[in-house]
């Protein structure tokens, strides 16, 4: 509230004589004008620097080495949408091997060779369902197997992700914390070291610049304490709204849903698996789209699920397994995967989409082909009716 000026305490009827005005010389007036102009120039320069144009710091946790409890997000306004479309390629669960089941030859450098041509876009996003760490697991101790599974590859394997074309990785999932806090720090450090942004720890938003001056914000969700919690839908909505103030395009990637071929359909209520809550997948996806997300990408069930459109935005409920070197079952539907390729307008509006089908070998290595387009088309029709995405035989995706 503005403070009221003090009342005049002088006795009534007496006036303080006004000071005599001094004549200002022409030279003095010129000096004063010059000083004012200099001050205006300095203020303008400071404002430009503060706005961050041309040198905006990354508003992801790109330089952090541990998850933080609070949002690591600048309170900025989203820049105006650029004039060019934005392309994105995104995939599901990715594990490059773990010592207990065997690491791939050549340090994993050939794992993505068969699908690298599909991983093209201004933003290439994946779900890193493992740690990049060494030593014994914080979850399973010295070994995995039986009822405990822990996944980690050496930190040097981050180079394989970079070489494949990934620009952002989500570490919001049930295996990212298999090596505990130290493993999470190691993972983030390894990704930072090769220039890959990350999202997933509580409150984090990865923001990636795109050609033409655009920006894409990516929010990662999972139903775990070390992630932005997918069970807290109001919290997810708040984070998406914050992301929408930072970038004109917002993508949500979420590790939710029960696992296995029995769970290819998206239920209307909450999902559980082995007694563990796995989120209200349908309600979560629709809520974040209503809050401003331009694309929702799910993973976690280890199988493909259907797709729908809401408010003109695409929801892909699960992209299944993408790479699981000797760690995933690849029989039946678990071996069918895909690369989702989407073109969005500068404001996030859906322009075009394609599901490029991928199949996994018995060792979990991806290559083009398979039946995922046919499977997803059928699931979309069965689960979503009038809002179902339409998939052509070649994988092209169009709204209903």
Each PLM stretch: what is its role?
Residues 2-23, 30-400:
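Acidic, metal/ion-coordinating pockets
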């Amino acid at each position: 509230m503005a403070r009221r000026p003090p009342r005049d305490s002088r006795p009534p009827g007496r006036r303080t004589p006004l000071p005599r005005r001094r004549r200002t010389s022409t030279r003095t007036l010129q000096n004063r004008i010059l000083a004012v102009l200099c001050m205006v120039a300095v203020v303008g320069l400071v404002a430009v620097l503060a706005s961050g144009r041309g040198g905006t710091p990354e508003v992801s946790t790109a330089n952090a080495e541990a998850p933080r409890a609070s949002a690591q997000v600048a309170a900025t306004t989203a820049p105006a949408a650029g004039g060019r479309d934005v392309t994105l390629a995104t995939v599901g669960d990715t594990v490059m091997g773990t010592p207990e089941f065997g690491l791939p030859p050549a340090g994993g450098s050939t794992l993505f060779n068969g699908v690298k041509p599909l991983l093209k876009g201004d933003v290439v996003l994946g779900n890193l369902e493992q740690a990049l760490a060494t030593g014994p697991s914080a979850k399973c101790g010295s070994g995995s197997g039986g009822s405990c599974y822990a996944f980690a590859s050496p930190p040097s394997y981050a180079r394989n992700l970079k070489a494949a074309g990934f620009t952002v990785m989500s570490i919001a999932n049930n295996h990212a914390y298999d090596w505990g806090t130290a493993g999470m720090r190691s993972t983030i450090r390894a990704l930072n070291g090769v220039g890959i942004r990350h999202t997933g720890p509580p409150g984090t938003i990865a923001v990636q610049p795109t050609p033409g001056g655009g920006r894409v914000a990516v929010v990662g969700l999972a139903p775990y304490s070390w992630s932005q919690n997918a069970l807290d839908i109001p919290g997810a909505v708040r984070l998406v709204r914050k992301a929408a103030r930072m970038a004109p395009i917002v993508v949500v990637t979420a590790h939710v849903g029960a696992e296995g071929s029995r769970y290819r359909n998206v239920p209307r209520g909450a999902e559980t698996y082995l007694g563990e809550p796995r989120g209200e997948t349908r309600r979560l996806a629709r809520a974040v789209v209503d809050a401003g997300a331009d694309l929702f990408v799910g993973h976690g069930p280890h199988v493909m699920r259907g797709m729908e459109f809401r408010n003109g935005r695409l929801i892909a409920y699960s992209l299944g397994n993408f790479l699981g070197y000797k760690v995933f079952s690849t029989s039946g539907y678990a071996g069918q995967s895909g690369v989702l390729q989407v073109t969005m307008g500068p404001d996030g509006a859906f322009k075009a989409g394609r599901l490029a089908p991928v199949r996994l070998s018995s060792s979990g290595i991806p290559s083009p082909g398979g039946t995922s387009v046919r499977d997803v088309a059928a699931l979309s029709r069965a689960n979503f009716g009038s809002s179902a995405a339409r998939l052509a035989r070649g994988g092209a995706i169009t709204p209903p």
